[in-house]
Amino acid sequence: MNHYTRWLELKEQNPGKYARDIAGSMNISEAELAFARVTHDAWRMRGDIRDILAALESVGETKCICRNEYAVHEQVGAFTNQHLNGHAGLILNPRALDLRLFLNQWASVFHIKENTTRGERQSIQFFDHQGDALLKVYATDNTDMAAWSELLARFITDENTPLELKAVDAPVVQTRADASVVEQEWRAMTDVHQFFTLLKRHNLTRQQAFNLVADDLACKVSNSALAQILESAQQDGNEIMVFVGNRGCVQIFTGVVEKVVPMKGWLNIFNPTFTLHLLEESIAEAWVTRKPTSDGHVTSLELFAHDGTQIAQLYGQRTEGEQEQAQWRKQIASLIPEGVTA
């Protein structure tokens, strides 16, 4: 039985199951599944990733899905305000479509057309060198379908050359680092983005760095912290930021949390233009971190799975040049265990 036939069979047996999970049960990547669907309900796309992203601006509203193994982040918005120079790119629309792109990870693109209970659904799906989905861009009822069709005509190709998938590079991480030096450099930061440089300089994972410094910089909290802080944010009505990412893409929500619904092990946020599904039992560690900036410290809640994957990161909404929200700091403070000086 070929992959496409098996896909149809499993999809019928598991209505509502994510393509990623069905591909996993077939022991193939999601990109390999898309490859198998070509000539049926998928088409290969060719061209520079930046050109395809730039062309997406013309279609207007889309629904974008960025996910990892444990969290799914869905945001409605348009591909305006693009900055796609070099290996890093930005789609910069706070409170709408807000993306951070690591373009050297982007490898293949497919157009997929599916029949659902709600009618036909069209998407453009981007995959990395390992065959995992980085970003899925869906047409909505408000998408300019004439512009969408023009984009497809420009980039779809008849060639479906074999995928050249690579294994994930095993991270080489430091087993010994000078805790006092790491802490000193952490306290000397003036911008949250300097944290990535600190990790790289010492060859550390985020969690390793957290374990090296004092509790006022990084403090482990209960794995139920996410549910607690979402409930607080919903009740208080302050704007928060929710980051979910993978190897090549991070999608950011900024706004008020309107509806939080736990369901079948998933913690969900349902807003009109934003949805989050996060597998709550996958949270193996939760950390509150404080990073110094020129505007005072910035506090985040960071969630990790047992395999070290960063599931999600949450911040209080903050505009550059302004101090962090007092309400967010209060909500974060309620997560800190009693007796911990943080």
Describe every region a protein language model picked out.
Residues 1-115, 119, 340-342:
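An N-terminus-focused feature that recognizes amino-terminal "leader" regions
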